[in-house]
Amino acid sequence: MLVRISEIEVVSQSVDEYQRILGEEAEASVRLEPGVLCIFPSAQRGNPTQIRILEIYANRDAYNAHIRSPHFQKYKTSTLDMVKSLRLVDMQAMDAKAMPLIFKKMGGQP
């Protein structure tokens, strides 16, 4: 399993458009890619230029397939001028066995 947090700062004039494009990409990734377990974007409360994305992939191959996908490439090229900074932080799941229980508990809830 590969777990990553993307820390993104967006140009303030582009926040709405960036969030729209990111939302489309996240939905397509989870729907179309079996190895993408989670793409969960969030904006910092009170500071929407600060975006964090929790990304969970089945493995490194799933991640590599994801970044080559047409929807990710469209997202990347469409938002290039909107991103002020990007930091990718690889994480180590402390209890990977509990993760499926979290998603099961969600039971399709929004």
Please provide the spans of the model-predicted regions:
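N-terminal first-folded block
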Residues: 2-41
